[in-house]
């Protein structure tokens, strides 16, 4: 029985040595998902912060709901809104 144990240990030793010595082949379909995930999270974080800064800067306004700011030049003289503005400024 002792010889069977020795043979078993010898075979296991040979298998581990053969596995350790085999050169690692480069598999083109092995991807590094951890660096891909970290890169995606960094880009998502940058875009999120950029979006918050754009919203807080108030530079991006909707054109259909934008009120005329004071001090801006009037619209064209032929429009109805500009004629009302001219009349309202004369009364002041």
Swiss-Prot record:
GO terms for cellular component: apical plasma membrane; caveola; intercalated disc; plasma membrane; sarcolemma; sodium:potassium-exchanging ATPase complex; T-tubule. It comes from the Eukaryota. The chain crosses the membrane at residues 36-56. Pfam families: ATP1G1_PLM_MAT8. Major plasma membrane substrate for cAMP-dependent protein kinase (PKA) and protein kinase C (PKC) in several different tissues. Phosphorylated in response to insulin and adrenergic stimulation. Phosphorylation at Ser-88 stimulates sodium/potassium-transporting ATPase activity while the unphosphorylated form inhibits sodium/potassium-transporting ATPase activity. Phosphorylation increases tetramerization, decreases binding to ATP1A1 and reduces inhibition of ATP1A1 activity. Phosphorylation at Ser-83 leads to greatly reduced interaction with ATP1A1, ATP1A2 and ATP1A3. Palmitoylation increases half-life and stability and is enhanced upon phosphorylation at Ser-88 by PKA. It is a single-pass type I membrane protein. Residues 65-92 are annotated as: Disordered. Keywords: Cell membrane, Glutathionylation, Ion transport, Lipoprotein, Membrane, Palmitate, Phosphoprotein, Potassium, Potassium transport, Signal, Sodium, Sodium transport, Sodium/potassium transport, Transmembrane, Transmembrane helix, Transport. Residues 57-92 are cytoplasmic. It is found in: Cell membrane, Sarcolemma; Apical cell membrane; Membrane, Caveola; Cell membrane, Sarcolemma, T-tubule. Residues 21-35 are extracellular. Residues 1-20 form the signal peptide. The modification Phosphoserine is found at residues 82-83, 88. Residues 83-92 have a biased composition (Basic residues). GO terms for molecular function: chloride channel activity; sodium channel regulator activity; transmembrane transporter binding. Changing residue 62 to S: Significantly reduced half-life. The modification Phosphothreonine is found at residues 79, 89. Homotetramer. Monomer. Regulatory subunit of the sodium/potassium-transporting ATPase (NKA) which is composed of a catalytic alpha subunit, an auxiliary non-catalytic beta subunit and an additional regulatory subunit. The monomeric form associates with NKA while the oligomeric form does not. Interacts with the catalytic alpha-1 subunit ATP1A1. Also interacts with the catalytic alpha-2 and alpha-3 subunits ATP1A2 and ATP1A3. Very little interaction with ATP1A1, ATP1A2 or ATP1A3 when phosphorylated at Ser-83. Interacts with the non-catalytic beta-1 subunit ATP1B1. Belongs to the FXYD family. The cytoplasmic domain is sufficient to regulate sodium/potassium-transporting ATPase activity. Associates with and regulates the activity of the sodium/potassium-transporting ATPase (NKA) which transports Na(+) out of the cell and K(+) into the cell. Inhibits NKA activity in its unphosphorylated state and stimulates activity when phosphorylated. Reduces glutathionylation of the NKA beta-1 subunit ATP1B1, thus reversing glutathionylation-mediated inhibition of ATP1B1. Contributes to female sexual development by maintaining the excitability of neurons which secrete gonadotropin-releasing hormone. This is Phospholemman. It comes from Homo sapiens (Human). The lineage of its organism: Eukaryota, Metazoa, Chordata, Craniata, Vertebrata. The gene is FXYD1.
């Amino acid at each position: 029985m002792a010889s069977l144990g020795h043979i078993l240990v010898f075979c296991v030793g040979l298998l581990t040595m053969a596995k350790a010595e085999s050169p690692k082949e480069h598999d083109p379909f092995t991807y590094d998902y951890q660096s891909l995930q970290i890169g995606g999270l960094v880009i998502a974080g940058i875009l999120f912060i950029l979006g918050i800064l754009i919203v807080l800067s108030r530079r991006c306004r909707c054109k259909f709901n934008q009120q005329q700011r004071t001090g801006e030049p009037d619209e064209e003289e032929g429009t109805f809104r500009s004629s009302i503005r001219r009349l309202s400024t004369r009364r002041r």
